[in-house]
Amino acid sequence: MNKLFVGSEIGQLRRVILHRPERALSHLTPTNCHNLLFDDVLSVEKALLEHDQFVKTLENQGVDVLLLQDLLEQTLENPEAKEWLLKHQISHYRFGPTFANQIRSFLLEHSNKELASILLGGLAFIELPFKAPSMLQQLSDPFDFVIDPLPNHLFTRDTSCWIYGGVSINPMAKAARKRESNHLRAIYRWHPLFSNQDFARYFEDENRYYDNATIEGGDVLVIGKGNVLVGISERTTPQGIENLAKQLFRTHQAKQVIAIKLPEDRSCMHLDTVMTHMDHNVFSVYPRVIDKNMGCWSITPCGEQHLDIKEMPNFQNVLMSALELDNLNIITTGGDSYEAEREQWHDANNVLTIKPGVVVAYERNTYTNEKYDKAGIHVLPITGDELGRGRGGARCMSCPIERDGI
C-alpha cells in the first residue's frame, strides 16, 4: 500500500499537515477580517499557543505532524517550483507589467523561509522598498495588501483532502481562498516527500476554470470501505461532487459517493461542522441539521464515462449499508437547545479521530464532551478559545495524508 493513503475517518492517524498561521493572523483587522472570511480578530499570541498545544497533543499520540509553512519553504528550494508559484501569483494582469516584474524581483531577494512566510501571510504596499511607475501602487493605501494574507490556510482540511490513494486539490468556493490551492499543487508536485510518489491527483490543472464545480475538504468524509460521504453546502456544489466522483471512479479509488444536502448557512458551512465519525458505528451529529430524512443521493459509476445518481429515502440506512453495519450510535450535541446551539457554533461536532474511539476536541464544549465520555469515546481536550473563533475545530485544522483503513 502507498504510504500516502487515507483509508477512513477513524483508522490510526499516522501523518498530518497542519498550519501555524502567525503572519496571516497578525494581518487580520476589524476592517478586513470579513473579506478574509473571519468573523473576528483573534489574539495572535493565544491562538499560536493553542495551536502549539494541538500539535503536541497529536505528537503525544504518535502522529507525525508536518507544518505547511515548512513544506512550502522546502518546496521553494526547487527553482522550477519557485518560478511556477511566482508566475501564478505575481502576474502582469494582476499588477501591470512593470510593477509585476519589480515585485517578483523583490521577492526573489528573500530567503525561501521569508518567501514562504510572505506567500502565506501577506505583504503590504508599505513593505515595498521601491516606487514603481505603477498607477496601482500610486493609488493604493500603504496598508493595503500587495499579496493578501491567507489566514484560512489554518484549516488545512479544506484546500486539499486525501481520499484513499489520491488527493483532491480543491477548487475553492471563495476568492479569499483560491490562492491556497496553488500552494498545495506546488507542494504535491515538487516537494521530495510527494514528488517521487505515485498517487492520483484530482482538480490539479491550475489553468482550468472550474466555474461552479467547487469543493472543500471540510465537506468530504472518507468513511471507509470504498465509500465517500460529501456534503452539498455553501462551499461545495453538486457539480463539484459529480466531477470528484467521476475522477474517483476513473482512478478506482472509490466505489460510491454519498451526497447529503446541508443548509447554506455559516454555522454549518461544511459537513464536518455538524457530523464527524468517531468509532466504527459512532458518529457525532448536530440533530438540527443531520437526520435520516435529509436529502441524500447515492452516486456510483455507470460504465466508463457516466454516473448513476439515485435519490435515497433514508440517509441512516444508506450509511449503515455502506459501512456494513447493523446499527449506528448517534451522539448528538450536548446540553439543552441553547447550549447545543452554542456548542455546535464552537465546533463541538468537529472532532479529529486519532484512532477508533479516541478524538481531539475543544475542551470548552463541556456538555457534548460529557456525552462523548459516557458513550465510551476518549476525548483529548485542547484549548480553542481563540482558534475556535475562526469557525473550525480539530478536524478542520488538519489534513491527514496517512491514515489506516477500517
From Swiss-Prot:
A GO BP entry: arginine catabolic process to ornithine
EC numbers on record: 3.5.3.6
Keyword flag Secreted: no
GO cellular component, one term: cytoplasm
Molecular-function annotations in GO: arginine deiminase activity
Substrates-to-products reaction catalysed: L-arginine + H2O = L-citrulline + NH4(+)
Keywords: Arginine metabolism, Cytoplasm, Hydrolase
InterPro entries, A to Z: Arg_deiminase
Active-site residues per Swiss-Prot or TrEMBL entry: 396
Pathway annotation from the record: Amino-acid degradation; L-arginine degradation via ADI pathway; carbamoyl phosphate from L-arginine: step 1/2
Signal sequence annotation: none
Cellular compartment(s): Cytoplasm
UniProt entry tagged with the keyword Hydrolase: yes
Recorded family membership: Belongs to the arginine deiminase family.
Official protein name in the record: Arginine deiminase
